[in-house]
């Protein structure tokens, strides 16, 4: 099982993770199953966790440690679709793992804040974007950010799995 090899390597490099090894494996399995089933990951947090959300999405939507080139079939389709740009697109595009940071979308966020309830903006986005089989990842330094917790409630009601990252003491 290659997953266990990676987990052992991770915990040997970062011994503090040994205490949450089972949680790390469970989070990995949730994400793996989401992507295997054609789902997407939606991520949110506040302040520094907002920046973390955007960063994680950036790594998922393009290659990270390894480049993820498009398939030969898609490269051929690009070249057929646009003789001028297809070759360049095929060489530059990378296979992404579908992910959305719920922390952007300024128009929606400010409209919902003004018209409804700003603490529920992540919940509203999950309700609109999410489907059963997707994953919501909530990031919080305290572990009890109310806007993230509203989103967790919507996720649970919608059959969206949740992964929580508490980044604090």
Where are these regions (language model features)?
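Generic N-terminal amphipathic, Lys/Arg-enriched alpha-helix
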Residues: 1-19
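Hydrophobic alpha-helical transmembrane segments of small proteolipidic membrane proteins, enriched
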Residues: 12-15, 25, 40-41, 162
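Hydrophobic helix-cap positions at the C-terminus of alpha-helices
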Residues: 17, 31-34, 129, 155
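A short, well-structured juxtamembrane/interface segment
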Residues: 19-37
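Residue-level recognition of alpha-helical structural elements
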Residues: 20-24, 49, 156
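Glycine/serine-rich anion-binding loops at beta->alpha junctions
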Residues: 40-57
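Glycine-rich phosphate-binding loops that contact phosphosugars or nucleotide phosphates
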Residues: 55-169
